[in-house]
Curated annotation (Swiss-Prot):
Source organism (scientific name): Dictyostelium discoideum
GO cellular component entries: cytoplasm; cytosol; nuclear envelope; nucleus; RNA nuclear export complex
Annotated site, Pre-siRNA binding, chain positions: 706
Protein name stated in the entry: Exportin-5
Transmembrane segments: none
Amino acid sequence: MNNDIILVVNQIEQALSLLHDPKSNNKQREESQVFLEEIKTRANAHSYAIAIITTSNNDILKHFALHIIETLVKNRWYECNDQERELIKKEILELMRRITSNEPKFIKEKLVTILVDVIKRDWPQRWMNLLTSLIEISKISDTQTELVLSTFGLLPHDIIFDTGSTSQVLSDQRRKDLMAGINLAVTSLFEYFYQLLESKYTQYKQPTPATTTTPQQTKQVIHLINVLLTTLRSYIEWVPSKVIFDHKLDQIFCQLILDVPFRMGACENLILFLGRKGRPDERIELIQTPFNFMENFLNSIKINSDFEDDYSFHKRITQALTILGTVHLNAYDDKHKIPNNYNIYLQLMLQMVSHPSILLSSFVLPFWHTFIKVESLELSYLEEVIKQIMETMLVKFVRIGDPEKSDSEQSKYSEIDFGTSKEWSNFFGGVRTRYLDIIKLITIQRREMAYIFIATKVADVLDALKANLNVASLSHEQTLVLESHSHILDSILLNIKDFTPESSLFFNKEQQQQPNIIQLTDRVLNLLFEINSTEPNITSFQIDCLQAYILYYQTNPESIKFLLNKIVPLIPFPGLDNPNRSFQNSVLHTRRRAISSLIGISTNISHLMKPYFDILYKSVVELFQKNVVTETEKVMLFHLLIVFSNNLPSYQQTLDFYKGILTPIIEQWVSLEMSTALSSPDAFIQYLGLSIADSQNLDATLVSRRKNIQYVASTLQIFWKKSQIPTNSSDELFAPFISNGISYNGKWPISSFVKQVLPGVLSLTRTLHQLWMPEHRAKIHPSLSTIFNLDDSITAPLLGFEYHKEQKSESSNVTFLRNILDCLRDACYEIVGYGFNHSDELFSLPDLPLVLLDSVFSYLESIENRHLKLLVKHILNYLIKNCPTKLEHTIFEPILPLLFSVLFNRIKAGWELIKLRSQKGEKENEKNEIVEDKILRDVSMEFLMCCSNIITQSPNYIFSSIDVMTPMVYGISSCLMAMDTPILKKSLIVSTQLLVDHEKVNDPKFFKLIGSEMFGCCIKILIVNKFAEFSNDIQSIIRLIYMKYYQICNYPQEILLSLPNITPPILQAFNKDLISTRSEKSQKVLFKKLLQDVIGIPLNKLKKESILDLPEKLFISKISDQSNENISNISNLFN
């Protein structure tokens, strides 16, 4: 080593010392960093690195030396001469030979990384003896063995699998050379792997006197075997299956799952082995060994070591078993027999699906979904297996296992898998849907068995309830069990009705071939009619079960009178005066379930309910006269009556019916007291007493006002929302007509009340918008200030918490006032929106735009995003859909520029705030991150839906108004940049809708808007490349815009010229190629080449290393539920 090299090495050591010394100042660190970076770029930098590697014992210095070599290999390898390259390769291998077990891990890892980088550039042509050298090195000690295994394990990741770094380094030819080399070497490699595994496993399992091992040596042997299993994972997916079978690795994996130290590695290799690509017959060959060793799988889950380690293994082996069974079923046909030990396998899968862990049990659902769909399986015990599945689904459907409630076995596992109740709740909701999917499949294929199963279960529960009628109240878990039974009963009966042939005969007593179905149904219904409980949750269960039997009532209409005799008396269910708040809430739920069940039944079988209309009407009137129902229940009862009135034969009859109910309501609505209260924020605040402190002893008049205004507005809302056109209107001189392309059978009876109702609705809407202004909010008493916040019943589910009224800490008056404000706003928006839907009454107003701007579209700067979402959804969309073409310019021109500008500014500001928050790493409170962001997504989605509607409904207007098009395009561009999957997906659809089939976008006034703003926005999204799955869609938008504009304006070219590597000559050549290219496919190829090869935007989707890299919770959604003819290989399920 010459003196110059020694001098530089000493300088490097000093610079590193200063860089890592906490006492160094910033200037010293900066100078050291600059010097060290300059060293890496020197032509003879490798000589310093080799000098350090061969002489120094300083770990930091050696690590920097390896960095020097890594920089050279990655950036200047092909600039080095042969002598320099050979020297570096020799020193790397020498270092590998000398390295000891005490060497820091970061040096070992860096050494392996460098070696693989050199291999990628020189092997096999310029390093033919590499593999021999590595295998010889591995014999030196266990340390060298581990390094060699790590090298072999890392190599395929950069060659076989396409990663971002590899795609930039390796040419296609280089990749082919490496593939050829590794394929030639794979047989000898696997011989080495096998011999090493055999040797080390024998040493672990059967140490001889000559090889007696210490605990530390045993630990090292275990470690080496696990490193080898990790290395095998890099090959097991793609090497020829013959190589695996020749070395009996499939059998070895099945054996190793019985050894606690190796079971996880063996299981992960099995997952990759079973997920190999191949033809059906090849895949059938893969599964033979695991089925033959099924006893090992069964025994492996009985081994107890450490609770969490055991559980982790159980999750992995469940994934392996699921893939095993799914591969078999997807390749199954008449040529293949049922595998050996299939009964043991199904026993295991039943055990796994009934496991207390919601996550683990969810892993097997894809298998059972596929299993049920394969109807050709010939198993003598098939019916019994299906019954056990249904039994399990019924048990698992009960919502138990919250990790923050550690009183159950399910919760113990949830604590491991889920950090919060929110995470668990979201996951449970998705899995619960999958339970219903499986029940649906079983019902479609075996409807009699499915019904008998659930009806028997319900009957048994009812028998138990009948024997214990004196129970004061049910526990929360008992209530959940009842809810699961009624829910699944409803699901099965609904599936029988909608998805099975001749469902109308299912409950036909004369044609049903299984008399036990009729007998069982009679037993269930008799119990439901007989039981009279004072416990509200039991009564709710009865109501839910009775509502589920709509199919039975269709076939046996004589039972309807018994149904009504049971449910109608339950409407005023007693118990609202109970001091227990939880009991009160259950009573309210029961009363409302009774009414909603009547609404549901009447809606579904309205023709059979007609004879009972008078009886029901008299019952409702009697309930009103006795004043035994609340205001909310009155509105629900009005809904019930509307369902009946929608079937009245004539317009006049319907109108007279409405007048009988609405006349007193409208009288209150137009009264001087009410009109004054709705006219301004000050009057509204005074009328509702919003400036008065919250108190439990409020003035009765004030309480009455609050209840009454909500009752009146809700009644008007329900009539506008649920009423329909009488089917025979045309018989009474109301001829069918068409408005804006929509065909109407006749006149809407409810629209006769527009002139009376609308002024108050518009006045109230304006007042509500003003109420959110700071100067008016300041007039609200501080004790009521939270009425402007979202209610816990809305935020709790968004945050993943269960909501229970009895856990609410705020005053009931505050909650009620908040509900009043929300109810009034919803009522106003829906009355106006449905008014647009009720033909032409509103559109006949001569000053409609001014009326709307002065009311529903006034003070928009004050309202919140959640209100803006409702306004767009309930008013703007209906206005756009129903506006007559001849009035579009008159109505839209004053309104849409203002409204679209507001929406654009809200959307842009909202997504920029989220982006800024993520860049700064700020952690705001959970409500801001979840609730507000969720509302912003909803606003963005409603805006995009609105854009889609107006492009479809009013293309002539939208392309004639730059004042509307400008904020609309800017808004769509903001949604494109939102980096949110659903929003981006919808934005791409709307963008395509805007550009395709509308030649008017070629108007010069849109050139900059679309050719620059939207085009540039799409380029930015590609560069960020966070959503590889949308890459092709974004490229299509880019191509569409460019093809429309590149010959008539310069805006798209200006965007491209601002990007790296794009010069005027390159762009001119590109345009010339486009002119000569006519096919869309060829255009796509040109654009992809320009974007990827010239500009350097990474367009290729990156492949996951393996299915093992998927988060466990995504596993269930990645296993396919498709039938075998639609799936070619299991690997596709995880891409």
